[in-house]
Amino acid sequence: MPAPRPQRLVRSAGALVWRFTDPARVALPGEPIDPADIEVLMVHRPRYHDWSWPKGKTENGESLVAAAVREVEEETGQIITLGAPLTTQRYRLGGGQTKEVHYWVGTPVPEGHSSERLRAPVARAPRTEIDQTAWTSPERAADMLTRRGDRRLLADIVARAREGRLVTTTLLVLRPGQGLSPRVDEAGDTHASASPSASSGGSAATAEAAAPAKPRPAPTPA
């Protein structure tokens, strides 16, 4: 039986964002990837004098998926789409609080892609919070990270790359007679990224398409 969730819980979300070192290379689902062929996106926090992964607290009524995408954009300027979920980190804070951080694999949305038009503008984090960002190799990132939990997440990304599990796709399963909204049908968007508007009353299908890919059974005939 899982341990009970702490009463004083601070929920946060973030992503380990990666890209190929070769900008012309296209990611294919199930393709094994040499970790030397990718870079990961890190942020420097002057308050703690450390390098870490972009993340932050959820806002009122915000889903974890939307928070992860928003926080990455606030801290790095990158608009991303989320892939597979990673290990959730949990640790104690002062005052009897427990922090729970949910992470996903993230990839940058191509510049000028239609999904950018679905998002509200996001203000960048102040330099007192994040003063540097860096794309770096997984090998160098392992030396830069200071927290063991962050290094475990990096190890997961590296393992997924080697095993062909880094690139995933989203599968929408509709009940018989259920159709996509015109917004999604017309866009044909495979890079939809979650946004506060999508998570708080926007198109349900758009929000679903932005969520991490999960295996689902195929629909059965009615």
Can you annotate each of these PLM segments?
Residues A13, H102, D131-Q132, V167-T170:
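Generic beta-strand structural signal
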Residues R8-S12, D22-R25, W104-V105, R147-D156:
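Short coil-to-helix leader/linker segments, especially the first N-terminal amphipathic alpha-helix
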Residues V167-A222:
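Active-site-proximal alpha-helix that buttresses catalytic centers in soluble enzyme cores
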Residues R8-V10, P35, G96-K99, T128, ...:
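A generic fold-level signal
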Residues P32, G56-K57, T98, D150, ...:
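Short, glycine/charged-enriched secondary-structure capping and boundary segments
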Residues T58-G149:
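Unchanged
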Residues P2-W53, T170-V184:
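N-terminal strand-loop-strand
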Residues D150-T168:
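Charged phosphate-binding loop/patch that engages nucleotide di/tri-phosphates or the phosphate backbone
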